[in-house]
């Protein structure tokens, strides 16, 4: 097929290019918490109600397409890229998206660094887990900056709707946009990290276009 194929053994749909005609979406969910994940890491999460309790921002049909979502940035000596290609759109040496039953894996490789971003919603808990695995395929030591990003919405269209504190569970929806910076390690970034203090500053290497 032109853009992907079915992997019957793993029960996955495998997408071989990030340049699909439209975002190709996988639906993840448990009892109360749900996420939509595109083949480039776009999408959004919501708690019980997709319209009234939307938690992160996402442009599905509007231009530009597939912006915002479940993003992880990798800074390798000034080369900034994403495992799912968007939004940096740095050309990858290899790319694969695996949409499975209840999970999505975005696999990208650039300059000898392989990254796999696995997204899933665990049963029995109201959260999304983004698990990042990094592999250095070269013989030389490498130093990387890795940081995650979400843009919270918390409700109806954010330009008009008031947000009631009673709408969402307490504390765990107080997110920051850059929950962690991880150096030379494999890390996990969950989008329910609480933050009681001020939003931490963005790293100096923040790509152009990020807030």
Residue ranges and their predicted role:
Residues 1-211:
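Anionic coordination/interaction segments
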